[in-house]
Design a protein with these regions (language model features):
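C-terminal membrane-cytosol helix-exit motif in multi-pass small-molecule transporters
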Residues: 59-78, 262
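Short amphipathic helix-loop junctions that connect adjacent transmembrane helices
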Residues: 111-128
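Hydrophobic core of transmembrane alpha-helices in multi-pass small-molecule transporters
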Residues: 1, 183-198
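C-terminal ends and interior cores of transmembrane alpha-helices
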Residues: 165-179
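Glycine-rich segments within core transmembrane alpha-helices of 12-TM secondary carriers
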Residues: 22-40, 226-234
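Helix-to-loop junctions at the C-terminal end of transmembrane segments
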Residues: 44, 142-155, 242
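Cytoplasmic membrane-interface "Motif A"-like loop-to-helix N-cap segments
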Residues: 152-164
Length: 262
């Protein structure tokens, strides 16, 4: 899904409008996710929901929407024919490298930031869910602002700001262990960390600017694969490090973010 989603965005949205338009799409996605999560939280006990019911209803609604779109919009014409095979081009090496580092950063957030909240502060499922809802609401508000900032200051400055911010956030995660900082600081870092995901749109629009139009679809597929290479080994490797020193995991994450900054 994400490969097709990113490919179509970069093909159809004009370069000058891309940062703002993609940011609105991100805000809309966060808003819909917020509503879905909130409905589950509010109706789970009231309606006696189960995982099976939630997945069946969600999957059924998605299938109905897909069928509607299939018949309502039978064909979209892309402005540029796309290469139908995978490609690797040397001139996209920086984009590939940044995608790999972005994947590593995502794994650290998904696996270890949440684990910290549970292990260190004993967060329950409902508390983690509430924290996630807060991050979604924040993205609804902040994502359009980030799109405007990227449009004004450019991708390079936006990405440098993201990587510098991530270094600070990961070091602060380590400080939770080294200095015994409390739950409010940790929760705030979790929200800020998640907000930084919105700055990933700068990497998308950077690629849109440097890519040959016919390379967008195949490179989106390659980049998505590169992004997930870290998911193969990083959680296991850092998981062993976590057993020795949880703070060291976040120090290593800060080092990775600093590599992207450089």
């Amino acid at each position: 899904y994400e490969t097709v989603n990113q490919s179509l965005q970069l093909q159809w949205i004009a370069k000058k409008d891309a940062p703002q338009t993609i940011s609105w799409l991100m805000a809309m996605g966060a808003a819909v996710t917020f509503v879905a999560y909130a409905l589950i939280v509010l109706t789970w006990d009231w309606l006696g929901l189960t995982y099976n019911i939630v997945y069946m209803v969600s999957g059924g609604l998605t299938a109905l929407i897909a069928l509607f779109c299939l018949f309502a919009y039978p064909q979209f014409e892309a402005p540029h024919p796309q290469i139908k095979t995978f490609i690797l081009r040397r001139r996209y090496w920086l984009y590939y490298a940044l995608q790999f580092m972005a994947g590593a950063r995502r794994q650290i957030f998904v696996v270890f930031a949440g684990f910290m909240m549970v292990e260190r502060f004993g967060f329950r499922v409902d508390q983690i869910t509430s924290l996630y809802l807060l991050t979604l609401f924040s993205n609804v508000v902040i994502a359009p602002v980030i799109g405007k900032v990227v449009g004004v200051f450019g991708e390079r400055r936006a990405l440098l700001f993201e990587y510098a911010g991530l270094v600070a956030v990961f070091l602060a995660y380590g400080g939770v262990y080294y200095f015994g900082w409390g739950v409010m600081i940790a929760a705030g870092l979790y929200v800020v960390d998640h907000i930084f995901f919105a700055l990933a749109l700068a990497l998308k629009t950077y690629f849109q600017k440097i890519a040959d139009p016919q390379d967008i679809a195949p490179t989106a597929a390659v980049a998505f694969t590169i992004n997930h290479i870290a998911a193969v080994f990083l959680p296991a490797g850092l998981g062993y490090l976590w057993l020795v020193s949880p703070a060291a995991v976040f120090i290593a994450a800060a080092a990775m973010a600093s590599v992207s900054f450089v």
